[in-house]
């Protein structure tokens, strides 16, 4: 526990230092390259490059700050033995180092260290609980991510033909573009590689909060931000189509999903499609802003959901979370804040990027089919978000039998995360100096955002009514007349207390008394046996003496 607390505090201080350095580089408008020539073979130079600019340092600040809050959060959430806690901490630190290598690497030779490290350590974290479902989910995760690693290796093979590991305009061809897109699509879970992200929810919730919401899944987006100028315009249309379909289908599935953790996972998948579609237009600054803001409120959302699951005995069914606002008001307030940020509620975290991106969609030139997909996907985002708010704030019969005291460490880490997301999102938005005068939209497009929000609210209310109907009829049958729920919430603690009493009091006392009784009995038997042996020895000795005297006299 002390080790994790010290690690979290040190990383928080390091993240603050990285933020100051990024602001300093942004003020100077400078970039730094560090090159280390490892080996030279003919004309090929194996150089290890590091690119340090304000984007890379800002992303390092983001990853370090989220990591520090989640490590402090995990002290209470991951209630494990010391050995398992050390394994969890070391895996998370290895993941953080791999993420640093990915962020700072500008060429394909040095990026492979972070890229392969992310895939391998992500697999180790998904199978952390050592269950069969975790093993199958981890295998799907690593196999789909290995497809992107194959693309990276093929790019490195093609680049040996040109004599350089650095991508450039005059050394690009069609195959390299396809392989770069394959890398980005597999790591950021775009269609048809999007199945691994919901399956990766078998990992512990702190892992999902760090890995599968803010860092690993955004690695493909960050890669394309670096190399977006090398992509052809025709490929950008295909990227827009695939990303819009990802956003549409992820939002559609999230409206029918009853697993609370998977709802947040599909929400992450929808936002990844949203960022990828914006990247196809070419607005890298807006994408980086939304990547930064989305990482904060989505990790916060996972932390809130994980704390609910921690108190509900790992029950992830959304139908069991009715009325949680009245039981855990502080935690519910933080979760509603993150949900409203996801919807782009005015002057919250997501408003600064999402509203501007939607206006850029209407201002840009794209395929009508992609535009329709993005509009419907945005409506679905509001729909499942409003459904979650209705579930939390509604009253339900079983809410009165569920109560567990809120954990202070979890609440403090979530509250700090919410405050930091509010401050830093507005700070980054002001520092990027967007030229908003170039966006001149008609009033009908300005009002389109509010229309989408209203349609999403209506759809969310209808989905909520559908779940409520199924909750009254279907769940009553499924839970065996609520007996499973009553057992988990009421009987389980009593049975565990009885079991503890039997093991540690009754059985231990009996064992102690029986052991003492046996020891006394054995001592008595040993004493009797020793006395018997002495008598036997004396008898034999007397007999021998008598025999000796007899022989002498004879």
From Swiss-Prot:
It catalyses: a ubiquinone + NADH + 5 H(+)(in) = a ubiquinol + NAD(+) + 4 H(+)(out). It is found in: Mitochondrion inner membrane. GO terms for biological process: ATP synthesis coupled electron transport; electron transport coupled proton transport. Keywords: Electron transport, Membrane, Mitochondrion, Mitochondrion inner membrane, NAD, Respiratory chain, Translocase, Transmembrane, Transmembrane helix, Transport, Ubiquinone. It comes from the Eukaryota. InterPro entries: ND/Mrp_TM, NU5C-like. The chain crosses the membrane at residues 6-26, 57-77, 93-113, 150-170, 175-197, 209-228, 238-258, 263-283, 286-306, 332-352, 379-399, 409-429, 441-461, 480-500, 532-552. It is a multi-pass membrane protein. It is an enzyme of class 7 (translocase). Its EC number is 7.1.1.2. GO terms for cellular component: mitochondrial inner membrane. GO terms for molecular function: NADH dehydrogenase (ubiquinone) activity. Belongs to the complex I subunit 5 family. Core subunit of the mitochondrial membrane respiratory chain NADH dehydrogenase (Complex I) that is believed to belong to the minimal assembly required for catalysis. Complex I functions in the transfer of electrons from NADH to the respiratory chain. The immediate electron acceptor for the enzyme is believed to be ubiquinone. This is NADH-ubiquinone oxidoreductase chain 5.
């Amino acid at each position: 526990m002390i080790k994790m607390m010290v690690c979290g505090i040190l990383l928080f201080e390091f993240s603050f230092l990285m933020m100051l350095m990024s602001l300093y580089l942004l003020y100077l408008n400078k970039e730094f390259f560090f090159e280390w020539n490892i080996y030279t073979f003919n004309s090929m130079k194996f150089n290890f490059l590091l690119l340090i600019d304000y984007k890379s340092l800002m992303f390092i600040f983001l990853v370090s700050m989220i990591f520090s809050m989640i490590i402090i959060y995990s002290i209470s959430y991951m209630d494990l033995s010391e050995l398992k806690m050390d394994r969890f901490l070391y895996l998370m630190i290895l993941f953080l180092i791999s993420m640093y290598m990915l962020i700072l690497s500008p060429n394909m030779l040095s990026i492979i260290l972070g890229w392969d490290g992310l895939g391998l350590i992500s697999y180790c974290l998904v199978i952390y609980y050592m269950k069969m479902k975790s093993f199958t989910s981890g295998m799907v995760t690593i196999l789909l991510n290995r497809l992107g690693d194959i693309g990276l290796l093929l790019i490195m093979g093609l680049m040996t033909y040109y004599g350089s590991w650095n991508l450039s305009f005059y050394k690009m061809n069609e195959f390299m573009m396809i392989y770069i897109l394959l890398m980005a699509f597999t790591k950021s879970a775009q269609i048809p590689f999007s199945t691994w992200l919901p399956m990766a929810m078998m990992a512990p919730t702190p892992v999902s909060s760090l890995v599968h919401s803010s860092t690993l899944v955004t690695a493909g987006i960050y890669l394309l931000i670096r190399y977006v100028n090398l992509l052809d315009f025709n490929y950008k249309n295909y990227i827009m189509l695939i990303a819009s379909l990802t956003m549409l289908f992820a939002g559609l599935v999230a409206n029918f999903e009853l697993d609370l953790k998977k709802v947040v996972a599909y929400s992450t998948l929808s936002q990844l499609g949203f960022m990828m579609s914006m990247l196809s237009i070419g607005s890298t600054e807006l994408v980086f802003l939304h990547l930064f803001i989305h990482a904060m409120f989505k990790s916060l959302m996972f932390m809130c959901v994980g704390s609910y699951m921690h108190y509900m005995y790992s029950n992830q069914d959304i139908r069991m979370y009715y009325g949680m606002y009245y039981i855990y008001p502080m935690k519910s307030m933080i979760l509603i804040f993150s949900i409203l940020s996801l919807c782009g509620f005015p002057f919250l975290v997501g408003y600064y990027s999402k509203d501007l991106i939607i206006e850029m969609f209407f201002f840009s030139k794209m395929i009508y089919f992609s535009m329709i997909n993005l509009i419907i996907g945005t409506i679905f985002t509001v729909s499942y978000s409003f459904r979650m708010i209705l579930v939390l704030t509604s009253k339900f019969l079983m809410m009165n039998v569920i109560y567990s005291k809120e954990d202070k460490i979890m609440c403090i880490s979530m509250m700090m995360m919410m405050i930091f997301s509010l401050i830093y999102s507005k700070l980054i938005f002001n520092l990027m100096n967007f030229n908003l005068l170039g966006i001149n939209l008609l009033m009908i497009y300005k009002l389109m955002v509010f229309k989408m929000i209203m349609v999403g609210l209506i759809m969310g209310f209808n989905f909520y009514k559908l779940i409520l109907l199924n909750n009254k009829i279907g769940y009553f049958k499924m839970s065996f007349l609520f007996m499973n729920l009553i057992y988990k919430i009421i009987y389980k603690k009593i049975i565990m207390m009885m079991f503890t009493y039997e093991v540690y009091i009754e059985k231990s006392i009996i064992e102690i008394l029986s052991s003492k009784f046996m020891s006394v009995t054995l001592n008595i038997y040993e004493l009797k046996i020793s006395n018997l042996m002495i008598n036997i020895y004396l008898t034999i000795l007397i007999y021998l003496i008598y025999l000796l005297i007899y022989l002498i006299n004879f």
